[in-house]
From Swiss-Prot:
Coiled coil: none annotated. The lineage of its organism: Bacteria, Pseudomonadati, Pseudomonadota, Betaproteobacteria, Burkholderiales. A motif ('KMSKS' region) lies at residues 243-247. Catalyzes the attachment of glutamate to tRNA(Glu) in a two-step reaction: glutamate is first activated by ATP to form Glu-AMP and then transferred to the acceptor end of tRNA(Glu). One of its GO terms (molecular function) is ATP binding. It comes from Burkholderia pseudomallei (strain K96243). Residues 118-139 are annotated as: Disordered. Residues 118-131 have a biased composition (Basic and acidic residues). This is Glutamate--tRNA ligase. It comes from the Bacteria.
């Protein structure tokens, strides 16, 4: 009988979490949802020097923002030490591990000799018990490490969902340290015990873990566990072709939120960063889960494309509810010195979002492009001299007068503008540009009738009158 699907995301809370990291949560999450399985969150926090609570918070916050909900966890490895020690004791009883007294200095010297001889540096099994072998005397005062008794013959073979069949000879693998002298277990051992205890059926992770896989499989088999399906994801590259990392300028997951990206856009983009469904570029979370499979995971490194993300974000911004955008934009307005009271006194923010969103790649950009609605106009002197000429002043005055009595609709404003243009034999830019400058302080706005409608009759008429006085 096939086991119910159980996947996991197992990050180390040692700082920065970027798109390349969180992709290793997205794909197992999607696979678990697709297969009606269970998605487990496990925090691998055994690196006490580098693990921080702030990093855990960043992981949880990033997952929550993208909607990557987990069914179990978060489990913390540091809270499972008793379980690891229990399994270590069982392995000692079964002669699956053995104490090794080789010092770090001795191991370094051994590796140097091996390199000099053109051999692969590895532990040579000095302390591995074998029938008829006489072991050295344990040195006084030295606490040993525990090494796993790796098989000496045969191969580790698995059918990777991304890489295909992978075969590693056991002769290539030395006896791995699975417990340090102080008794704390090492990474590869903890991972195996966790995957076994948590019933993980599919391990979907970055291909930087490929070298760990044969070692983990051997430990898992020694413990009587069933080997999961492995899918090792190729690296995510930055735009310069380097591995994505903080050192190479990668943005944190929450940095995208703080830059004005929508989570649905980032999730859509991230989904395509190593997986495809035909030519589909834009799809909902629900479609992604419905379509996701391991067969269409990419086999080559995926390269981050910021322009592509901006294009996707613009699409989702245009589709987004204007009231939602208004709430998201408020912090960006605040950062620009436009507080809630100023917004409340100005044009309807929801309406501003509806008008301004089509041209923006981010919510931050919408706010930046919309400051004209909440600040007094301060047009450039050169632009004023160019557009507000003596020749156009009579038309401006007539337009202002018409707006005093016109019905305040987009259609009525457009009709008044058209009538003045006809009466003065002007082309649209000759009147629209000075009106934009005097009312909004800039010539760069959407359709003039839509902009004036949002400003409101009183503001428009008073600003035109003040400029013409």
């Amino acid at each position: 009988m096939t086991r119910p699907v159980r996947t996991r995301f197992a990050p180390s809370p040692t700082g920065f979490i970027h798109l390349g990291n969180i992709r290793s949560a997205l794909y197992p999450w999607a696979f678990a949802r697709k297969m009606k399985g269970t998605f487990v969150l496990r925090i691998e926090d055994t690196d006490l020097e580098r693990s921080t609570e702030a990093s855990v918070d960043a992981i949880l916050e990033g997952m929550a923002w993208l909607g990557l909900d987990y069914d179990e966890g978060p489990y913390y490895q540091m809270q499972r030490m008793d379980r690891y020690r229990e399994v270590l004791a069982q392995m000692l009883e079964k002669d699956l591990v053995y104490p090794c007294y080789m010092s770090t200095e001795e191991l370094d010297a051994l590796r140097e000799r091996q390199r000099a001889a053109g051999e692969k540096p590895r532990y040579d099994g000095t302390w591995r018990p074998e029938p008829g072998k006489v072991l050295p005397e344990p040195p006084a005062g030295v606490t040993p490490v525990l090494r796993f008794r790796n098989p000496l013959t045969g191969s580790v073979v698995w059918d990777d969902a991304v890489k295909g069949r992978v075969e590693i000879s056991n002769e290539e693998l030395d006896d791995l340290v699975i417990a340090r002298p102080d008794g704390t277990p090492t990474y590869n051992f903890c991972v195996v015990v966790d995957d076994l205890d948590m019933g993980i059926t599919h391990v979907i992770r970055g291909d930087d873990h490929v070298n760990n896989t044969p070692r983990q499989i051997n430990i898992l088999r020694a413990l009587g566990g069933e080997v999961p399906v492995y899918a090792h994801l190729p690296t995510v590259l930055n735009e310069q072709g380097e591995k994505m990392s903080k050192r190479h300028g990668a943005m944190s997951v929450m940095g995208y939120r703080d830059a004005g990206y929508l989570p649905e856009a980032v999730l859509n983009y991230l989904a395509r960063l190593g997986w495809s469904h035909g030519d589909a570029e834009i799809f909902s979370r629900e479609q992604f889960v419905e379509w996701f499979d391991l067969e269409h995971l990419g086999k080559s490194p995926a390269q981050y494309d910021h322009n592509k993300l901006n294009w996707l974000n613009n699409h989702y911004i245009k589709e987004a509810d204007d009231a939602r955008l208004a709430e998201l934009a408020k912090p960006f307005f605040a950062a620009l010195g436009i507080d809630a009271d100023t917004i409340a006194r100005g044009p309807d923010l929801v309406g501003v979002m509806g008008l301004m969103k089509d041209r923006a790649s981010t919510v931050k950009e919408i706010a930046e492009n919309s400051t004209m609605f909440y600040r007094a106009p301060a047009p450039d002197a050169q632009a004023l001299a160019q557009h507000v000429t003596d020749a156009v002043r009579p038309a401006l005055a007539e337009f202002a007068a018409a707006l005093k009595t016109a019905e305040w609709t987009k259609e009525a404003i457009a009709a008044a503008l058209k009538a003045v243009l006809g009466a003065h034999k002007l082309k649209m830019p000759q009147l629209a540009m000075p009106v934009r400058l005097l009312v909004a302080g800039t010539t760069h706005t959407p359709s003039i009738d839509a902009v004036l409608l949002l400003f409101g009759r009183d503001v428009v008429v008073s600003r035109l009158a003040a400029a013409l006085a």
